[in-house]
């Protein structure tokens, strides 16, 4: 079930032959555009906490369910699942909603999309927030292997065997992924309902085509993606945030910070991949100070 905060205005856009569903809080003098992670994941998990903490601070929240997820159209054509096409989709939404220059926040996959967008449409950006993301996928994959190794050599051997045999649904493999998720995706004992709402409606066709079968195995069409060298050309004022225990770890954030010419970095010491749930007070204070 794709739960929607009733305070959002729902806007339907006709994009080529498809429908895109956008959400606009309508309130606030400063607009923040959210790009959620995934890919293929509805925007609930990112939309709801930002609405809760920012609208009463005068910040208008706009986001949308990217093509292939949530209430937007879900075509079966896998050729649609490319980062370049999503860049043009984002630019279409910006134009249709007449948003002008964006304060653009990209979380996880949304960060990869935001980086790619900034390289083509930098003049359409006011500020850029890159959250729990990276600019170099091969480097990330090496870091994920390091996180996997912390489970112990026997567990790593087991995981590699199931990945080679294609038995990723085996209970022992799934148990290892669950441990990694609670260490590096969200460290809360109970995950909020808005996370479950997104996870329960995840379009795995998009996710598996672009990324892979889970958060710790990248075999999709993004596995070689690397924009670190090009990021030196991004001059937009940028905030980079990362959790100390993040699946996209601080080393990824540091590489981006070193590449960008106008960025600052904030590490949340008690967070993994979702500091807006894990350390909301510190996270939203940092975000508000940067936006305003």
Q: PLM ranges: what are they?
A:
Residues 221, 228-271:
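Conserved loop-alpha-helix segment in the C-terminal half of the alpha/beta-hydrolase fold
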Residues 127-167:
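Flexible "cap/lid" loop of the alpha/beta hydrolase fold
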Residues 263-292:
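Catalytic active-site module of serine/aspartate enzymes centered on a nucleophile-bearing elbow/loop
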Residues 19-74, 79:
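Conserved HGGG/HGGXW glycine-rich cap/lid loop of the alpha/beta-hydrolase fold
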Residues 100-143:
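Conserved hydrolase catalytic core segment
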Residues 160-236:
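Alpha/beta-hydrolase
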Residues 63-109:
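Active-site loop/oxyanion-hole signature of alpha/beta-hydrolase fold enzymes
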Residues 2-19:
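N-terminal cap/lid segment of alpha/beta-hydrolase-fold proteins
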């Amino acid at each position: 079930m794709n739960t929607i905060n009733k305070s959002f205005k729902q806007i339907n856009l006709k994009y080529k032959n498809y429908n895109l569903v956008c959400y606009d809080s309508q309130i606030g003098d400063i607009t923040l555009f959210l790009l959620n992670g995934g890919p293929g994941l509805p925007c609930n998990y990112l939309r709801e906490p930002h609405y809760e903490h920012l609208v009463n601070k005068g910040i208008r929240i706009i986001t949308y369910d990217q093509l292939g997820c949530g209430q937007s159209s879900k075509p079966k054509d896998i050729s649609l699942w490319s980062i370049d096409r999503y860049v043009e989709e984002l630019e279409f939404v910006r134009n249709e909603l007449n948003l002008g220059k964006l304060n653009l926040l990209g979380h996880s996959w949304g960060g990869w999309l935001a980086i790619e967008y900034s390289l083509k449409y930098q003049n359409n950006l006011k500020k850029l927030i890159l959250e729990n993301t990276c600019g170099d996928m091969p480097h990330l994959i090496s870091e994920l292997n390091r996180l996997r190794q912390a489970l112990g050599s026997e567990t790593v051997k087991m995981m590699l065997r199931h990945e080679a045999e294609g038995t990723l649904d085996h209970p022992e493999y799934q148990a290892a992924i669950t441990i990694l998720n609670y260490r590096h995706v969200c460290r809360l004992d109970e995950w909020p309902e808005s996370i479950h709402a997104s996870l329960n409606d995840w379009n795995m066709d998009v996710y598996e085509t672009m990324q892979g079968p889970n958060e710790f195995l990248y075999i999709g069409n993004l596995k070689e993606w690397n924009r670190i060298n090009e990021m030196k050309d991004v001059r937009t004022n940028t905030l980079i945030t990362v959790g100390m225990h993040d699946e996209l770890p601080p080393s990824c954030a540091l590489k981006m910070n070193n590449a960008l010419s106008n960025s600052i970095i904030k590490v949340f010491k008690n967070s993994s991949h979702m500091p807006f749930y894990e350390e909301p007070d510190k996270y939203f204070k940092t975000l508000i100070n940067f936006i305003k």
